[in-house]
From Swiss-Prot:
Residues 143-377 form the Radical SAM core domain. Pfam families: Radical_SAM, TRAM, UPF0004. Its main location: cytoplasm. Belongs to the methylthiotransferase family. MiaB subfamily. This is tRNA-2-methylthio-N(6)-dimethylallyladenosine synthase. It comes from Burkholderia thailandensis (strain ATCC 700388 / DSM 13276 / CCUG 48851 / CIP 106301 / E264). It catalyses: N(6)-dimethylallyladenosine(37) in tRNA + (sulfur carrier)-SH + AH2 + 2 S-adenosyl-L-methionine = 2-methylsulfanyl-N(6)-dimethylallyladenosine(37) in tRNA + (sulfur carrier)-H + 5'-deoxyadenosine + L-methionine + A + S-adenosyl-L-homocysteine + 2 H(+).
Length: 457
């Protein structure tokens, strides 16, 4: 009987990528298959996030729930990976003694060895070391599950923003060699992937050796240019970028590489220079706005999303008003917005914070309502337009329909004959938008005569 692994992922796209790699590693080593049911699993893994306190506590809540499964099935192995694992280490086992494995983002490739050691010794295994880029040399080839794929190009962060725990849980920035990244993407393209999202905590800080051990370095712009030349790759996305690392070379790539989408996630975090300085972000609001103006001069249809922190220590009403002014001016399509959460060990955790919680919540609600108005307005502006989408698979709302994504990352659901589904999935097609909802669209196929004939037979 095939053994199964269940992985629950918290947090960012980097964690989503790492979770996929955990499954790949265990499949290659022990033949385990992924399951969506923890009750059916032989191994349960939690890939954790420590960016906010709520996400961290959720992990221990979920661990408490699977404890009963272990009591009923003693051979069940439970593991905690990701950033909470890096931060807490062996204290996780002290708090939850039924946990068998604790591993960091850089040691997930060692899971098979850790499992063997746990079975042999009967003791919990903890490995939260930072062996830099070693894990990529030990990962099996990716197993593709659709026409889009994440590709991690670097690990860690060296910015040390005052509020952020990531440099302490993922280490400093380390880039993969250029040829390693290109080899992985070419392999994905051979399996039908048409869109890649390049991942990094500060992805545009990429500085990778041309080959392992080489002295010549490729910057992020060079990497994008090479990826665009890989046969089969139609679209390139990336996340998350940092305004401080947005070079002229990268701006030039937007003019030269049409496969780089008209969508950018560029965290601003706040609209007040005073707060940005306290956050140690390394740029001013004016510098951020100047960068966006340059980008939109090159790409007038650029869709922009961001991250914003509300209620950072010392934030006044005037500071928050500046954030709102920036939101109105930038016309963000999406914002991942949260109330500031102090993280242990970060400089900001020691700052005085006298803003009442209810005031922070009111500000967050005001910000999110404004963003939602922007989202709805942008969706409405797409009505009647023909959009190029990558068909990803059956619609979640109706499996008889198909769904794809626009360049600005909107999901479009559209009807198509069941006989055409297999042919259309993974293809770039045109759809005319005929209904707009805040976070998704509805459209209809726009086909040439020959295509229309093929699609309906």
């Amino acid at each position: 009987m095939t053994k199964k692994v269940y992985v629950k992922t918290f947090g960012c796209q980097m964690n989503e990528y790492d979770s996929d790699k955990m499954v790949d590693v265990l499949n290659a080593a022990e033949g385990l298959e992924k399951t969506d049911s923890p009750e059916d699993a032989d191994i349960i893994l939690f890939n954790t996030c420590s960016v906010r306190e709520k996400a961290q506590e959720k992990v221990f809540s979920d661990l408490g729930r699977v404890r009963e499964l272990k009591e009923a099935k003693p051979d069940l192995l439970i593991g905690v990976g990701g950033c909470v694992a890096s931060q807490e280490g062996a204290s996780i086992v002290a708090r939850a003694p039924y946990v068998d494995l604790v591993f960091g983002p850089q040691t997930l490739h060692r899971l098979p060895q850790m499992i063997d050691a746990r079975r042999e010794s009967g003791r919990a295994q903890v490995d939260i070391t930072f062996p830099e880029i070693e894990k990529f040399d030990h990962l099996p080839p990716a197993r593709v599950e659709g026409p889009s794929a994440f590709v991690s190009i670097m690990e860690g962060c060296s910015k040390y923003c005052s509020y952020c725990v990531v440099p302490y849980t993922r280490g400093d920035e380390v880039s993969r060699p250029l040829d390693d990244v290109l080899t992985e993407i070419a392999g994905l393209a051979d399996q039908g992937v048409r869109e890649v999202t390049l991942l990094g905590q500060n992805v545009n800080a990429y500085r990778g050796a041309l080959t392992a051990g080489a002295h010549e370095i490729a910057d992020f712009a060079t990497l994008i240019e090479y990826v665009a030349d890989i046969p089969g790759i139609e679209r390139i996305r990336y996340t998350t970028s940092h305004p401080k690392e947005f070079t002229q070379r990268l701006l030039d790539v937007y003019a030269k590489v049409p496969k780089l989408v008209d969508h950018l996630h560029l965290p601003v975090q706040h609209g007040s220079d005073r707060i940005l300085m306290a956050m140690k972000r390394g740029y001013t609001v004016l510098e951020y706005k100047s960068l966006i103006r340059k980008l939109r001069a090159i790409r007038p249809n650029l869709s922009l999303s961001t991250d914003i922190i509300v209620g950072f220590p010392g934030e006044t009403e005037a500071d928050f008003d500046k954030t709102m002014a920036l939101v109105h001016e930038m016309s963000y399509d999406t914002s991942f917005s949260f109330i500031y959460s102090p993280r242990p060990g970060t400089p900001a955790a020691n700052l005085a914070d006298d803003t009442p919680r209810e005031v922070k919540l009111e500000r967050l609600q005001h910000l999110q309502a404004t963003i939602e108005e922007n989202v709805a307005r942008i969706s409405q502006s797409m009505l009647g337009k023909v959009e190029r989408i990558l068909v990803e698979g059956p619609s979640r709302k109706d499996p008889n329909e198909l769904a794809g994504r626009t360049e600005n990352n909107r999901v479009v659901n559209f009807p198509a004959p069941l006989t055409a589904h297999a042919r259309l999935i993974g293809q770039m097609i045109d759809v005319k938008i005929n209904h707009a909802y805040p976070h998704s669209l509805r459209g209809e196929l726009v086909l040439a005569h020959d295509d229309a004939s093929a699609a309906t037979h």
